[in-house]
A protein has these predicted regions:
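Short alpha-helix capping/helix-loop boundary micro-motifs
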Residues: 1-5
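Compact nucleic-acid interaction/catalytic patches
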Residues: 26-32, 37-73
Length: 131
């Protein structure tokens, strides 16, 4: 039985998430990674997440990198977020967990928040993402 984390996070929060692989949607990914909350669905206790990766070498349309203010974001290294890869996921312990070394506890799997200076790059990436 899944345990729901409460309270729900807010858009802009960065969470430790088992984002699913494209080939296995509906099942948690094999290991957790950072994910960015884009929307919250209170009626179904779920969040809309975007995929995060430390592979920041190439940045394509619909992607942006947080490479500064890592402490605010709760990230250990620069991280690319892919706004082309979105998933609505239940906010529970099957899909989310506490990140190693992170001390923010509300809501539990929260790592940090998107630093305000990255809102403009995120909006620009959203505007040119694949539809």
């Amino acid at each position: 039985m899944a345990y729901d984390f409460k309270p729900l996070p807010a858009p802009g929060d960065i969470l430790w998430c088992k984002f699913p692989h494209d080939e296995d949607l509906g099942n948690p990914g094999p290991y957790p990674r950072p994910g960015l909350v884009l929307n919250v669905f209170r009626d179904i206790h779920a969040v809309l997440m975007t995929y995060g990766t430390s592979q920041v070498g190439n940045v394509y349309d619909g992607e942006f990198v947080i490479d500064d203010q890592l402490d605010t974001a709760g990230l250990a290294a620069p991280t690319k977020f892919d706004l082309n890869r979105l998933q609505k996921l239940p906010f529970n312990d099957i899909w989310f967990g506490a990140s190693p070394g992170v001390t923010i506890t509300v809501p539990l799997p929260k790592m940090g928040v998107i630093p305000p200076i990255f809102m403009a790059p995120m909006r620009a990436a959203w505007a040119i993402r694949k539809k």
